[in-house]
């Protein structure tokens, strides 16, 4: 297995089928950040059959001299619960980036650290993922927000009708201006 640079089509095909896909790991977000002075790199871990099994958008910023740092917004598109896969991805990524003078990368993976029920009973504890990342050399910086509210809705039209009128108008205007919404 090795890390290679993916073209936009390869990255888009992989990211569209991945369960952790998000707007910050997209070509559109990369193009937006390119206007803010970042260089975009689409990197993927391929197996022996040339199948992509992990990928990331890496935003590159030059530091002084020949050195660079990278930022992977919302983490990698990989199964963080598969410790051997994340280990291989990290080792190969370090090798790949070292040859291009990267001194560090920053990422903020979208991992639910702890999930509580509505009555604040711990339902799921994923601290083992954080511990595994620490073993691989990642430094954990505590998240500043305490809770993220997730609204589970089966009917998108009902949810939309419950929005304030001004929010519905803003959504309508955005769609008319070409903003696309992905689920």
Predicted regions and their residues:
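N-terminal charged segments
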Residues: 4-48
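Acyltransferase donor/substrate-recognition loop-hinge adjacent to the catalytic core
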Residues: 1-9, 129-183
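Hydrophobic, Leu/Ile/Phe/Ala-enriched alpha-helical segments that form helix-helix packing faces
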Residues: 15-18, 93-97, 133
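Short glycine-/small-residue-rich flexible loop motifs, especially phosphate/cofactor-binding loops
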Residues: 12, 30, 94, 130, ...
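Aromatic- and acidic-residue-enriched segments that line the glycan-binding/catalytic groove
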Residues: 119-128
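Conserved donor-binding loop and adjoining core beta-sheet/short helix segment
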Residues: 32-114, 118
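Charged, low-complexity surface patches
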Residues: 85-86, 122, 163
């Amino acid at each position: 297995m090795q890390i290679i640079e993916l073209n936009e089509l390869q990255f888009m095909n992989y990211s569209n089928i991945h369960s952790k896909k998000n707007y910050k790991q997209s070509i559109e977000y990369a193009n937006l950040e390119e206007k803010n002075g970042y260089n975009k790199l689409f990197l993927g871990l391929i197996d022996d059959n040339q199948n992509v099994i992990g990928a990331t958008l890496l935003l590159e910023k030059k530091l002084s001299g020949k050195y660079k740092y990278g930022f992977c917004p919302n983490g990698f598109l990989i199964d963080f619960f598969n410790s051997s896969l994340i280990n291989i991805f990290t080792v190969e990524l370090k090798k790949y980036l070292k040859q291009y003078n990267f001194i560090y990368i920053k990422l903020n993976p979208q991992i639910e650290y702890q999930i509580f029920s509505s009555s604040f009973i711990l339902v799921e504890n994923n601290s083992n993922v954080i511990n595994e990342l620490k073993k691989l050399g990642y430094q954990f910086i505590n998240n500043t927000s305490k809770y993220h509210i997730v609204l589970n809705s089966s009917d998108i039209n009902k949810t939309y009708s419950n929005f304030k009128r001004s929010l519905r108008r803003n959504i309508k205007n955005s769609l008319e201006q070409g903003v696309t919404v992905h689920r």
